[in-house]
Amino acid sequence: MIDFYYAPTPNGWKVAIMLEELELEYTTHLMRLGDGDQFKSAFMAISPNAKMPAIIDHDPPKSYGTNSVSVFESGAIMLYLADKFKRFIPTDPLGRKEAMEWMFWQVGNQGPMAGQLSHFVNYAPKDQQDYGHKRYGGEYERN
């Protein structure tokens, strides 16, 4: 069984899709970011950077020992699950390398650029949106 700490964000959606595609049993814990749920000590013990998403796997691979395992960051969670269930990740070295390149590109480039663009579109004062659109829109479209 997996506890899934989730907020309806692109990073949360990625992990939710992975859990569904693996047809796993999991319990969703909705984190109310506006209420500061991510800063509560119980959650910080799971995700020390106070970011979504995170999981606790109560039945980890034997190589992890007998205790439950927590994993935070969407890419780390997806890789952990892919490795555990031997699905959605190539096992040959070249295929795995290529999958890692695309995963790291998404979590380190495309995802953050989309997040910054969304921030400027949704929250920047109208007179400051042009810079955000030019900077992050251009990077996002380039990706």
Q: Where do the PLM segments sit?
A:
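Amphipathic alpha-helical packing segments from all-alpha helical-bundle domains
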Residues: 132-143
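GST-like domain detector, emphasizing the conserved glutathione-binding G-site
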Residues: 1-132
